[in-house]
């Protein structure tokens, strides 16, 4: 860290130093001038790219002529004017037979015994469990 600060300080002192011939100062001025000129050239290129002027000599854009097509002399692909035979689609009947509704009956009889709603339980047991006769899930060993 101290070394880089010392090097920068020395470079600043050297750049300000005027030698007898001015070679060192001319070197830095030449580098700075070339960087400045290339930056100006890039700036001009970008400016002309996004904001083109009419003085740039782009005369092709002003000489655009639109020609309308005429159907009289146009040559296109030959086409037959024969009618195409169309077959009608078959008609499908959509009538349905109505049936009398039936009364749904539960297959299990309660028989006076209180099952607490287990007669309607149709769920399965988890893996590793087995259904008992009264509808509970019991672990298998």
From Swiss-Prot:
InterPro entries: GBP_PSP (IPR003463). Residues 46-118 are annotated as: Disordered. Disulfide bonds join 125-137. GO terms for molecular function: cytokine activity. Residues 83-98 have a biased composition (Low complexity). Pfam families: GBP_PSP. Residues 23-118 form a propeptide. Mediates the spreading of plasmatocytes to foreign surfaces. Plasmocytes are a class of hemocytes involved in insect cellular immunity. This is Plasmatocyte-spreading peptide. It comes from Chrysodeixis includens (Soybean looper).
